[in-house]
Amino acid sequence: MLKGGAVWALGTMSGTSLDGVDAAMVLTDGERILEFGETRYRAYSEAERAVLRAALGRWPGEAAVAEAAEVVEAAHAELLAAFRGAEIVGFHGQTLAHEPGGRGTHQAGSGERLAQALGVPVVWDFRSADVAAGGQGAPLAPFYHFACARRAGADRPVAFLNLGGVGNLTWVDPRQAAPEAPGACLAFDTGPANAPINDLMQARLGRSHDEGGRLAAEGEVAEAVLARFLDHAFFARMPPKSLDRDAFADLLPAVADLSDADAAATLTAAAAAAVARGAAHFPTPVRQLLVTGGGRHNPVLMAMLEARTGIEVVPVEQAGLDGDMLEAQAFAYLAVRVARGLPTSAPSTTGVPACLGGGRMSRPEALALQP
């Protein structure tokens, strides 16, 4: 059993970019964040990335999925062994397939191997219960955002914007009693963010991303393409809502006839315009968007966001948070919530019918008793 009060929790995140694994420690009781601890990163090798790429979109029972699980578990075991003092681990795994309302969701990697290797309880498979109950299974960081706003002493609603492959917004009111309370959190995906820009750069120029937004800065936005993008049915749906990375697969073909610079400018504007559409759903206005994820390093995107939303847009570091480790910290926090029977999602965050605590826990002592 996990002791009472605050404990040091270690969380991990491996995102859709397949770059590597983030790991971070947080001192928390599952409600408050008392202290931030050590952080580490382990990059995937090219060989490991190739195995993971081969498993994307596949489901358990296929050989590629088993091979991906081996890579994920070994990489995490190596990284997490370097930490000291963790009393519980929140292990997200690597999402390979995610079909809410369809086949479900699957993250490669079992918490059992990590529990045996590390000798502490491991919480994993955070999303399946939410999806099985009718939720989207994402996003799961909003309850942590609520705790971050509380820790920062916020006395009014705050919004967090994550700019990864897909963008997502979290609106929180830290004046509410708890993150699962009615009116405390609203979260949803905004639309494509970095993914189309990165795909364009890779396809046309062999680069992983538009460094500093320099290419977009040289181009002009194709307003007709942008208008067609904003006509997509996704933008008419009310939140909460989630989006697969490839749901807007027609966006790259839409800029095929544009120059490299104009295409980059148009895709960057599309990411900003999608966020502006999303911000219109906030229950009450906010003064700032606190931005996390790789997109915060793109000054052109940040400027477009500010222009289109009319809200001050700042990197989350200005609030004393670590924009590179926020999601890993979130799964450390969520692990303690799971261990203590607290909810990890709500109707206003994933669309699940009622507040729900997801996750499975593997304990090393229980595994040792297995034949």
Swiss-Prot record:
Q: What is its EC number?
A: 2.7.1.170
Q: Which UniProt keywords apply?
A: ATP-binding, Carbohydrate metabolism, Kinase, Nucleotide-binding, Transferase
Does the keyword field hold ATP-binding? yes
Catalytic reactions of this protein: 1,6-anhydro-N-acetyl-beta-muramate + ATP + H2O = N-acetyl-D-muramate 6-phosphate + ADP + H(+)
Which Gene3D superfamilies does the UniProt record give?
3.30.420.40
User: Keyword ATP-binding, does the record have it?
Assistant: yes
InterPro entries per record: Anhydro_N_Ac-Mur_kinase, ATPase_NBD
Q: GO MF annotations for this entry?
A: ATP binding; kinase activity; phosphotransferase activity, alcohol group as acceptor
Q: Which residues bind ATP?
A: G15, T16, S17, L18, D19, G20, V21, D22
Q: Which Pfam families match?
A: AnmK
| One annotated GO biological process | 1,6-anhydro-N-acetyl-beta-muramic acid catabolic process
Pathway participation: Amino-sugar metabolism; 1,6-anhydro-N-acetylmuramate degradation; Cell wall biogenesis; peptidoglycan recycling
Role of this protein: Catalyzes the specific phosphorylation of 1,6-anhydro-N-acetylmuramic acid (anhMurNAc) with the simultaneous cleavage of the 1,6-anhydro ring, generating MurNAc-6-P. Is required for the utilization of anhMurNAc either imported from the medium or derived from its own cell wall murein, and thus plays a role in cell wall recycling.
Q: Report the sequence similarity comment from the record.
A: Belongs to the anhydro-N-acetylmuramic acid kinase family.
Protein's recorded name = Anhydro-N-acetylmuramic acid kinase
Q: Which organism is it from?
A: Cereibacter sphaeroides (strain ATCC 17023 / DSM 158 / JCM 6121 / CCUG 31486 / LMG 2827 / NBRC 12203 / NCIMB 8253 / ATH 2.4.1.)
Record gene name: anmK
